[in-house]
Amino acid sequence: MYLIEPPFFVLATQNPIEQEGTYPLPEAQLDRFMFELRVDYPSREDEERIVNETTSDETATISPVLSAAELLQLQHLVRRLPAPPTVVRYAVQLARSTRPLDPEASADVKRYVSWGAGPRASQYLVMGAKARAAMDGRAAPDIDDVRSVALSVLRHRVVVNFQAEADGVEVERLLSLAERPARG
């Protein structure tokens, strides 16, 4: 056993096109990642800079942006922000609305989803909303903060069934449908 000093977190990459040579993570392990972020191709200028920096003999210079202590302070700051009951209620309702057996799930979620987001999704919706509010200089998150992080928090937690794949229904569409009941 190794003691890992805080702050400790894991970043992982996954190539959405080619899975050969990689081992897909089971849903239970994917659920431990707070966000799934999609990264688009870089701009022409950024790609040229990447090529120049990675094909030369020069060693890249990396400068820290934050110390470990500063990062821990920011993490504690986010946790100290209060989440209003309306935000917690919305996050829980949104996560629950992705579950096909939940009475408030939409007909499409019931038809196309095999497995919806679990309680960890509700936690991460609130934590993501708190972080967004903190970055924006606000003392507490609101429902719009939850909405802004919802796709990144939920996308990798919702498993569609064969019918969804056959009908060309993607997770992103189902999440927009799942959000509708929670808005009321």
Question: What label would you give each PLM region?
Answer:
Residues 100-184:
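C-terminal engagement/docking regions of AAA+ P-loop ATPases
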Residues 1-81, 130-132:
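Canonical AAA+ ATPase core
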Residues 50-51, 91, 149-154:
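Short alpha-helical scaffolding segments that buttress acidic/His motifs in well-ordered protein cores
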Residues 61-122:
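Conserved AAA+ ATPase small/helical "lid" subdomain
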Residues 25, 46, 66, 86, ...:
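Alpha-helix N-cap and coil->helix boundary residues
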